[in-house]
From Swiss-Prot:
Catalyzes the reversible transfer of the terminal phosphate of ATP to form a long-chain polyphosphate (polyP). ATP binds at residues 45, 460, 553, 581. Pfam families: PP_kinase, PP_kinase_C, PP_kinase_C_1, PP_kinase_N. The gene is ppk. It comes from the Bacteria. The active site is at residue 427. HAMAP family: Polyphosphate_kinase. This is Polyphosphate kinase. An intermediate of this reaction is the autophosphorylated ppk in which a phosphate is covalently linked to a histidine residue through a N-P bond. SUPFAM superfamilies: Phospholipase D/nuclease (SSF56024), PHP14-like (SSF143724), PPK N-terminal domain-like (SSF140356). One of its GO terms (molecular function) is polyphosphate kinase activity. Mg(2+) binds at residues 367, 397. It comes from Campylobacter hominis (strain ATCC BAA-381 / DSM 21671 / CCUG 45161 / LMG 19568 / NCTC 13146 / CH001A).
Length: 696
């Protein structure tokens, strides 16, 4: 195969390859319920891709924009490639679903259609229908006086073709809308689930009395869900955002998912009203709401079909019986979630809320959980009279409503709530707490790569950095002043902030390694690499002989393996039990060489968001980051390597070498570390860690 010499890979096609790697997990030797989770994740990812990315390409095409980007693909080129790719991959999705369904049946867990149920389970399905479904579904007739209804984004329904009992020649069309509050897979026994559309279809004639069902087809619509808000024209951003959320429900239709082998007249009926381009219609022989598979994966009777549970560990120097402030007074601390517990982060905020010496708490909130103990602690602190400043990013996509709720609750408690800076999203993860003791101010700071969300911290890999170092006091204060006030000098000292500094600083460090040529070394771990300036700089470094390892979970627009250009760049993507979310950067000849950040290397992060990049100076903490990166580079079980063609190949275990699954390795490492600590409570953590590393 000839070498592709364009250094840029199309962003959308790269994303499709990432989602294919998610689907690929279903083929691996992992527990069956975990495979169901990956099916659900794949479908949820695809929903968002169509709602945002495909919808955006359609808008560009409709507007007549034909200019291509660095990858030389026009909007129409991309739409054609996306549709062809997904129509082909649909077959693979169906095959994996049926394969997993059969394997589950062999283990005694069943997914059955209504007509496959025995008499006892049919009766239970009927009871569920009449008591739980019938009262809240909406039967809709469509005729000259009752127009086709409005369908919200991701609405799920059953289209029906009916005839009157006393008039066999009559044909009527309608639908049965299935509420979001209803399960997509109904549990009729501990070991049996039924797609809800199968139950509703069986009872269509009870829903339309006096009519006979000729045929039915489950379907689901996807709308353009991108919200465009003119912030500069908004007097009250909260009101404008609430209006924008309503408009999301009315965006243009961009996709139709429908049951395979549907009655042609039903398809014609839907097409006449939805007017979705035929290549954006996907016909499925499997349930079209696989996001509902999460309902099955939580079945505790089949816990043996899931991964063994792992409990994140709280390790020294943290101690549940010791104040977190006194712990932070002694040293800087870096922990790696989810192997290490998120509890110290929550404990920091809770202690601050209760400590009478704390006078100020400032933090950024991007994606928080619905019942957030962190936000509740902030509310308690504000109610107690402490100065609380919360930057609540209302523009966090698909978390807007939850963030609106918390913003209002914080305001009612008396906190100063900031909604962001006009034209920018605030994506930085930072907390600053100030204590006043004996007339002196003491700063306690937390900087991280992940959200302040205890739920996601159990499944996302992220880094948390706790510090009282004076070098960060002024920077953290200035950052929050930038958020709350007027400040044109948006530059920090030790910390770097986008949009003014991070990209510039990264390019400087890449250039420094470039000057060292073959002695240079770069390792960068992130979620996505899209920014063209970063791609060009990395290729220039590679051409100079710098060895570069990129660990990019999702989109990567850099094409490796071009002779004389990017041949010294290796790109891997790790997909497994945990979602890789940490951003860690290493530059051999920089001082310090290690950084953590909230920012991916994308134009939106580097140019249109407020992000932070934090230098790590402590040698022991640098060593911890180094070990994380080394382990990921060596992974030969979860890693996929990006090839020059733009395709990804699974990294295989070399002959004579051991399998390295970095998720399993770290679980085992931290389990063993924790057990040893429990046995030797008086030993210092570094001594135990050294001993364990030697043993391993």
């Amino acid at each position: 195969m000839s070498e592709n010499t364009n250094i840029f890979i199309n962003r959308e096609l790269s994303w499709l390859k990432f989602n294919s790697r998610v689907l690929e997990q279903c083929k691996k030797d992992i527990p069956l319920l975990e495979k169901l989770k990956f099916l659900a994740i794949y479908c949820t990812n695809l929903d968002e891709f169509y709602m945002i990315r495909v919808a955006g390409l359609k808008q560009l095409f409709t507007a007549g924009i034909v200019v291509s980007g660095n990858d030389e693909m026009t909007p129409l080129d991309q739409l054609r490639e996306i549709r062809a790719y997904l129509q082909n991959e649909k077959n693979e999705l169906e095959n994996e679903y049926f394969k997993i369904k059969n394997e589950l049946a062999n283990k005694g867990l069943f997914i059955k259609n209504y007509n496959e149920l025995d008499e006892e389970l049919s009766a239970k399905a009927d009871e569920f229908f009449f008591t739980q479904i019938m009262p809240i579904i909406i039967p809709i007739a469509v005729d000259s006086t009752r127009p086709f209804p409005h369908l919200n984004n991701l609405s799920f329904a059953l289209a029906v073709k009916l005839r009157e009992e006393n008039n066999p020649e009559s044909v009527h069309f309608g639908m049965i809308r299935i509420s979001r509050v209803l399960p997509r897979f109904v549990k009729v026994a501990n070991d049996t689930y039924v797609p809800i559309s199968s139950i509703v279809g069986r009872h269509a004639e009870e829903i339309f009395p006096g009519y006979k069902l000729i045929s039915s087809a489950a379907f689901r619509v996807t709308r353009n869900a991108d919200i465009v808000i003119e912030e500069e024209e908004a007097d009250d951003f909260m009101i404008i955002l609430e209006e924008g959320l309503k408009l999301r429900r009315r965006g243009a239709f961009v996709r139709l998912q429908v049951q395979k082998d549907a009655d042609p007249e039903i398809l014609e009926f839907l097409n006449a009203h939805l007017k979705i381009f035929y290549k954006d219609v996907y016909e499925y022989s499997i349930p079209i709401t696989l996001d509902g598979l999460w309902e099955i994966t939580s079945n505790k009777d089949f816990i043996n079909l899931a991964y063994p549970p792992y409990a994140p560990k709280t390790l020294p120097p943290f101690d549940e019986n010791v104040s977190i402030f006194s712990t932070m007074d002694k040293e800087n601390i870096l922990i790696y979630h989810p192997y290490e517990s998120f509890d110290p982060v929550e404990k920091l905020i809770k202690e601050a809320a209760k400590d009478p010496k704390v006078i100020s708490i400032r933090m950024t909130l991007y994606r928080v959980e619905k019942n957030s103990p962190i936000v509740q602690a902030l509310i308690d602190a504000a109610n107690d009279g402490k100065q609380v400043t919360a930057m609540v990013e209302l523009k966090a996509r698909f978390d807007e409503e939850n963030n609106l709720h918390w913003a209002k609750a914080l305001e009612q408690a008396g906190a100063h709530v900031i909604y962001g800076i006009t034209g920018f999203k605030v994506h930085a993860k930072i907390t600053q707490i100030i204590k006043k003791d004996a007339g002196k101010l003491k700063f306690y700071m937390h900087l991280g790569t992940g959200n302040y969300n205890g739920s996601s911290a159990k499944i996302y890999t992220d880094v948390s950095f706790f510090t009282t170092d004076e070098m960060f006091e002024k920077d953290t204060t200035n950052f929050f002043h930038i958020l709350s006030g007027y400040n044109k000098n948006r530059k920090l000292d030790k910390l770097s902030m986008s949009p003014m500094q991070i990209k510039e600083r990264l390019l400087e460090m890449i250039m420094m390694e470039t000057e060292y040529g073959e002695e240079g070394r770069i390792v960068a771990k992130m979620n996505a690499l899209v920014d063209s300036d970063m791609v060009k700089a990395l290729c220039k470094a590679s051409a100079a002989g710098v060895k570069i390892d990129l660990i990019v979970r999702g989109i990567c627009c850099l094409r490796p393996g071009i002779k004389g250009v990017s041949e010294n760049i290796r790109v891997i993507s790790i997909v497994g039990k945990y979602l890789e979310h940490a951003r860690i950067f290493y530059f051999k000849h920089n001082n310090p060489g290690f950084y953590i950040s909230s920012a991916d290397w994308m134009p939106r992060n580097l140019e249109r968001r407020l992000e932070l990049m934090t230098p790590i100076y402590d040698e022991n903490l640098q060593n911890k980051l180094k070990e994380i990166l080394k382990l990921q580079i060596k992974d030969n079980n979860l890693a996929f390597e990006l090839k020059n063609s733009g395709s990804y190949e699974k990294v295989e275990v070399p002959d004579g070498c051991e399998k390295i699954n970095n998720h399993e390795y770290l679980e085992n490492y931290y389990n063993k570390l924790y057990k040893n600590i429990q046995k030797h409570r008086d030993d210092h953590i570094s001594m135990i860690a050294t001993k364990l590393l030697k043993e391993s």
